[in-house]
């Protein structure tokens, strides 16, 4: 997705500014966001999990702090993860606002770790940009990262092996 990881509020504001040549009103913003949630929630709740994610969560849960850092609004993100039975794997669930880079920097500060010891896993340019801004490592998932220099894969089936290599290098 070309604009993956950008908050819907930013997308709606851009649409009104660039296409309709005016600023979106607060009422229009709230209406569009509510309509978006209604139309998208069922799809999100019923979407298949990315291959490999459960193996990653089960292997690393309890060994290292795991966080979700997403452009999805906080309350909605928490609800989706709870309803999908995934929230229990995470030390923290961090949605917007603020932006991903600030969320990631905050996680690194909270955990009192060297950013070089943290890994951001993502599927959008905003994820790799956030990792770069926070100076963390990055693993890309999906077609966008096919030709990227970062470690990546079409899914998360190769993530555990890469993480194990990193962990072995830290011992």
Identify the function of each model-found stretch.
Residues 6-9, 153:
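Electropositive phosphate-/nucleotide-binding environments in soluble metabolic enzymes
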Residues 26-30, 47, 71, 98, ...:
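Non-catalytic, surface-exposed connector residues within folded enzymatic/regulatory domains
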Residues 8-13, 33, 74, 78, ...:
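An amphipathic alpha-helix signature
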């Amino acid at each position: 997705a070309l604009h993956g990881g950008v908050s819907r509020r930013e997308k709606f504001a851009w649409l009104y500014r660039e296409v309709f040549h005016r600023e979106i009103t607060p009422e229009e913003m709230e209406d569009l966001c509510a309509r978006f949630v209604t139309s998208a929630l069922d799809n999100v709740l019923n979407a298949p999990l990315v291959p490999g994610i459960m193996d990653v969560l089960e292997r690393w849960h309890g060994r290292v702090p795991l966080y979700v850092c997403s452009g999805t609004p906080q309350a909605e993100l928490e609800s989706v993860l709870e309803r999908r039975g995934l929230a229990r794997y995470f030390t923290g669930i961090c949605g917007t606002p603020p932006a991903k880079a600030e969320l990631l920097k905050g996680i690194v500060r909270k955990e009192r770790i060297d950013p070089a010891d943290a890994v951001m896993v993502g599927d959008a340019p905003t994820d790799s940009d956030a990792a770069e801004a926070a100076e963390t490592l990055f693993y890309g998932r999906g077609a966008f990262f096919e030709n990227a220099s970062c470690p990546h894969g079409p899914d998360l089936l190769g993530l555990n092996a890469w993480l194990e290599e990193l962990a072995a290098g830290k011992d």
